[in-house]
From Swiss-Prot:
<dbReference type="InterPro" id="IPR036635">
    <property type="entry name" value="MurB_C_sf"/>
</dbReference>
<dbReference type="GO" id="GO:0051301">
    <property type="term" value="P:cell division"/>
</dbReference>
<dbReference type="GO" id="GO:0005829">
    <property type="term" value="C:cytosol"/>
</dbReference>
<feature type="active site">
    <location>
        <position position="301"/>
    </location>
</feature>
<keyword id="KW-0961">Cell wall biogenesis/degradation</keyword>
<comment type="similarity">
    <text>Belongs to the MurB family.</text>
</comment>
<comment type="pathway">
    <text>Cell wall biogenesis; peptidoglycan biosynthesis.</text>
</comment>
<feature type="domain" description="FAD-binding PCMH-type">
    <location>
        <begin position="36"/>
        <end position="202"/>
    </location>
</feature>
<keyword id="KW-0560">Oxidoreductase</keyword>
<keyword id="KW-0285">Flavoprotein</keyword>
<keyword id="KW-0133">Cell shape</keyword>
<comment type="function">
    <text>Cell wall formation.</text>
</comment>
<dbReference type="InterPro" id="IPR011601">
    <property type="entry name" value="MurB_C"/>
</dbReference>
<dbReference type="GO" id="GO:0071555">
    <property type="term" value="P:cell wall organization"/>
</dbReference>
<dbReference type="InterPro" id="IPR016166">
    <property type="entry name" value="FAD-bd_PCMH"/>
</dbReference>
<dbReference type="GO" id="GO:0071949">
    <property type="term" value="F:FAD binding"/>
</dbReference>
<dbReference type="GO" id="GO:0008762">
    <property type="term" value="F:UDP-N-acetylmuramate dehydrogenase activity"/>
</dbReference>
Amino acid sequence: MMESGEALLKKLDGRLSGLRGRLTPDTGMDKITWFRAGGPAQVLFQPSDEEDLSAFLKAVPEEIPLLVVGIGSNLLVRDGGVPGFVVRLSAKGFGEVEQVCDTQLRAGAAAPDKRVAAAALEAGLAGFHFYHGIPGGIGGALRMNAGANGVETRERVVEVRALDRKGEVHVLSNADMGYAYRHSSASPDLIFTSVLFEGVPGERDDIRRAMDEVQHHRETVQPVREKTGGSTFKNPEGTSAWKEIDKAGCRGLRVGGAQMSEMHCNFMINTGNATGHDLETLGETVRARVFENSGIRLHWEIKRLGLFREGEQLEEFLGKII
């Protein structure tokens, strides 16, 4: 069982006294994630700005676990909670989007994807319309090479600013990010703080039309008004995850309060009282049934964090294909 957040802060007494951000022990992650499920963060830290984050990283011993989350759209938190520190970048210090020249935007890692799309529209820059349909933040988009409608984040990135676990600044080029489908090979220890994007000059009416099409498509085929984390699984090569899920008979499948959406069966939803364990068990059950039906191994697109609650674990037959 995880010790209390107060106990962790007491161990670090004095080390964190100069921070300007907010330290909150034993914070329910269900208040942060879009699934509205899961256990607590031992300590949640919300830095004021990059300088404050750097000071925090320099003060916290590297043996203490540390995880970074964005706006919580693609996170599944287990019910036993997340040990150590969870760092959440706030919109106040990391959420700005500004035009820096005719074709470039700089965005903080906590900026919602939609805000970047809106800023690009205002600047008359094409190539960012796909962000209008992604329910997430830029930090997560950089980490997973988020994309939609045939466009990916890597197509717009010039360079990414990040801090390492020692609080030192790094600037990564597009090549340094090592992008592939829904993946970046950049060190998982790096915390992205901002990005420089490159767009293409375009007509605002055309950009707005593309954004409207993205929004219409999303509202038509995705359960946007449900408690969901977005696409659950990555698309396998040569097919779509939802098609394989549907063929395996998993559309509408339920475990406890968790359900594969009837509207789009690659979306898991919390119907009201789902636990993190319900959601993960449902996802693993779907993976097992798809593998049994077609031999295809689905890979999670949603990031799973934390510890199982005492006495809980995934069913043995499911663990064989994790």
